[in-house]
């Protein structure tokens, strides 16, 4: 249950980051006021998902040691890298992929402790 909550917290925070990216991309090249930017559905999705992610994270901290749970949030690095590559078509070099593999290895080691 704790690992599922941790994955949910990761998913929600990643969704928030991706929604922020979509929000700023939608503003690019458009002269818009702060009020117009506040009307962005992407911005509100980002705020909602990050807020909900925080609440889920608090549940995680009630169930897991912070020394184990927090490093496992590095899964966000993996998820965001995949989204950057496949959704935003960003180039990811070999060193970056190697870093992703190391993060996955570290999370697997930590998950045995959880």
Swiss-Prot record:
One annotated Gene Ontology cellular component of this protein: plasma membrane
Compartment(s) of residence: Cell inner membrane
Biological pathway: Bacterial outer membrane biogenesis; lipopolysaccharide biosynthesis
GO biological process: lipid A biosynthetic process; lipopolysaccharide biosynthetic process
InterPro entries: EamA_dom (IPR000620), Flippase_ArnE (IPR022883), Small_drug/metabolite_transptr (IPR000390)
Membrane topology: Multi-pass membrane protein
Gene Ontology molecular functions: carbohydrate derivative transmembrane transporter activity
Residue ranges of coiled coil: none
Keyword Lipid metabolism in annotation: yes
Keyword terms, alphabetized: Cell inner membrane, Cell membrane, Lipid A biosynthesis, Lipid biosynthesis, Lipid metabolism, Lipopolysaccharide biosynthesis, Membrane, Transmembrane, Transmembrane helix, Transport
All copies of domain EamA, residue ranges: 43-112
SUPFAM superfamilies: Multidrug resistance efflux transporter EmrE (SSF103481)
The family this protein is said to belong to: Belongs to the ArnE family.
PANTHER family named in the record: 4-AMINO-4-DEOXY-L-ARABINOSE-PHOSPHOUNDECAPRENOL FLIPPASE SUBUNIT ARNE-RELATED, SMR FAMILY PROTON-DEPENDENT DRUG EFFLUX TRANSPORTER SUGE
Function: Translocates 4-amino-4-deoxy-L-arabinose-phosphoundecaprenol (alpha-L-Ara4N-phosphoundecaprenol) from the cytoplasmic to the periplasmic side of the inner membrane.
Subunit-structure text: Heterodimer of ArnE and ArnF.
Name of the featured protein: Probable 4-amino-4-deoxy-L-arabinose-phosphoundecaprenol flippase subunit ArnE
Annotated gene: arnE
